[in-house]
Amino acid sequence: MSKKGKKAKVPLSDEEQLLLFQQKLLAEEEMAKKKERLLNQFLKDKLAKEEHNSALNLNKINTQWRTVLREIKTRELHKDIEILSQTFERVVDCKDSVIKSLAKDLSEAEEQHAHALRSHLHSIDQLLALQRCRLNLLEENYNMELEALTKEFETERKTIIDQHEKEIHYLQDVFMAMEQNYIDSEYESKLEFQSMWDDLKNKNLEEKHFLRLQLENIVEDLWRRFQDALKNYTDATEDRKIAFETLKVKDEKSSREIEAQMKKIQKLQDSIIIFKGKILVHSRESEEQNQDIREDKELVLVQLRKLKAQRTQARGIAQENLVKLTLESSATLKALREIVDKGEKILKLAEICRKFETEEEKVLPFYSSVLTPKEQEEIETMDLEEFNEELGKVIMDYKGMENFWKRYNKVKLEQLSLRHRRAQLLEINEKLREMLRQYLDGISVSDEVLSQLNPLFIVNHRSNLPQLLPMPTAQPGDKKPPATYNIIEAAHVVSHTL
């Protein structure tokens, strides 16, 4: 049992160690390949999962966006219906007022029928002509409003379609940006995987080179030992010439073994020389490959840095554009809300002011132009020639506001005329006040009236106007008589003198 244990503890030979080491290397390479396959499978599964999630998210975004667009369209249609209903009610009120005025005229004409038949018939003809004119005007106004509403509807429809197309393009751009980001991330992961693979390859080559150097050192050591043993053997044979005959058989046997070993050694030396040459060639090739790979790696890293810088710059620009777009959209929404509030306020004021409209304003809300059609055409052509195309388009877009500005200008003119009339009445009132004050001063007596010059005021048959002749001077010893005032109205004096 002890001999078997000693045999089990015998160390392995160099060839067995080399085979064991090669088996370990093969096992490690198989493990690395297996890990690489697992990593590739994991990345493929992750890629498929990301593509599936992106498709689901895109479908969700499209469905939510459709609901938002439907809500916006319904609100706009509700607003259009409200505006149309208000205009219809206003037209109906105008027609009701026209019918009331015509009924009133007809009743008056029937009352006067017994007195003047001819005048009645004449007035009936005038009323019919007036009615025809009014109906024509109403029809023209209705047609104009209908055309304006159709144009407004078409423009709103066009703007909505354009906005929808812009939003579709924006979503497509967002999708392309997401796809580009995904491609960039995939490319970065591929670069990282390639760099890791190159590092592992370089590491394996270095380990292989180190093992080859180690094996060469072992072979050289064995050769040196063999030479020493051979030298010792030759020395021993010289010292033991006496035992040559006895050991001749052993010598021949050993010589044959030595020759066999020498052949093996020669073969090993030849194989070592061949392996050294191959190692040198492979080392040179590996150095060149490593140099090329390092240069390619540097170029790839430089390009990667540039791409990362460009991506960060593009991301910053996109973020700035997004912030600017949100600010501008919020500002436009605020401005549109203010415009809508102003329009609602104007409509409310118009409804309030309709109570104070006269019959004439209800029948003919818009005054006709004093210009002839020819002059109107000349002015329109001249205005369009003066402005450029863009400004002309804007003016044509706001042409439907002419009736509004007509009523506005009419109100401003009436306001100015009322102010002018008020100033005239104030001036007349001041003049009347002055005349009344003078009249009251003439019929009343007070210290202020006595102190002022008044030709109508006479005391003791004398007025208080200054006399041309000088008054006699009084003596210093004389006493002034008490002042007595006899008041006589000027009208009484004039009646007696006449």
UniProtKB/Swiss-Prot annotation:
Subunit-structure text: Component of the nexin-dynein regulatory complex (N-DRC). Interacts with DRC1.
Assigned protein family: Belongs to the DRC2 family.
Role this protein plays: Component of the nexin-dynein regulatory complex (N-DRC), a key regulator of ciliary/flagellar motility which maintains the alignment and integrity of the distal axoneme and regulates microtubule sliding in motile axonemes. Plays a critical role in the assembly of N-DRC and also stabilizes the assembly of multiple inner dynein arms and radial spokes. Coassembles with DRC1 to form a central scaffold needed for assembly of the N-DRC and its attachment to the outer doublet microtubules.
One of the record's GO cellular component terms: axoneme
Signal peptide stretch: none
An annotated GO BP: axonemal dynein complex assembly
Keywords annotated in UniProt: Cell projection, Cilium, Coiled coil, Cytoplasm, Cytoskeleton, Flagellum
Sections of the chain in a coiled coil: 98-160, 250-311, 417-441
Subcellular location: Cytoplasm, Cytoskeleton, Flagellum basal body; Cell projection, Cilium, Flagellum; Cytoplasm, Cytoskeleton, Flagellum axoneme
Protein name: Dynein regulatory complex subunit 2
InterPro entries: DRC1/2_N, DRC1/DRC2
